[in-house]
Swiss-Prot record:
Belongs to the bacterial ribosomal protein bL19 family. InterPro entries: Ribosomal_bL19 (IPR001857), Ribosomal_bL19_CS (IPR018257), Ribosomal_bL19_sf (IPR038657), Translation_prot_SH3-like_sf (IPR008991). The gene is rplS. This is Large ribosomal subunit protein bL19. This protein is located at the 30S-50S ribosomal subunit interface and may play a role in the structure and function of the aminoacyl-tRNA binding site. GO terms for cellular component: cytosolic large ribosomal subunit. The keyword Cell wall biogenesis/degradation does not apply. GO terms for molecular function: structural constituent of ribosome. SUPFAM superfamilies: Translation proteins SH3-like domain. It comes from the Bacteria.
Length: 113
């Protein structure tokens, strides 16, 4: 068991900021188009964090042109450029699935003062 932890430790990233559900984040994803590689930002609210260690993932939700879009990212993926925490949110739940049913201003999360 200890060997697995040692191998995973080498692959884990150490530049991940501390964030939790309810926070507004901007995730930069590395996209390859032909010979070029660029970083595509995806901005939204973290509605879920799942797993631990190398298998940890988080889901970000945003509304684009009236349609809800969710993307799930592995935290330690080499495809992620960087993660910026834009705003801290105050929530009482670990999973914010109820935001899927809300529209407009009701789908916002209160910020920490």
């Amino acid at each position: 068991m200890d060997i697995i932890k040692q191998i995973e430790q080498k692959q884990m990233r150490d530049d991940i900021p501390d964030f939790k559900t309810g926070d507004s984040v901007r995730v930069y994803v590395k996209v390859v188009e032909g010979q070029r590689e660029r970083q595509q930002p995806f901005e939204g609210i973290v509605i879920r964090k799942k797993g631990s260690g190398l298998r940890e993932t988080f889901t970000v939700r945003r509304t684009s042109f009236g349609v809800g879009v969710e993307r799930t990212f592995p935290v330690h993926s080499p495809k992620l450029g960087k993660i910026e925490v834009l705003r801290r949110g105050k929530t009482r739940r670990a999973k914010l699935y109820y935001l899927r049913d809300l529209k407009g201003k009701a789908a916002r999360v209160k910020g920490i003062r």
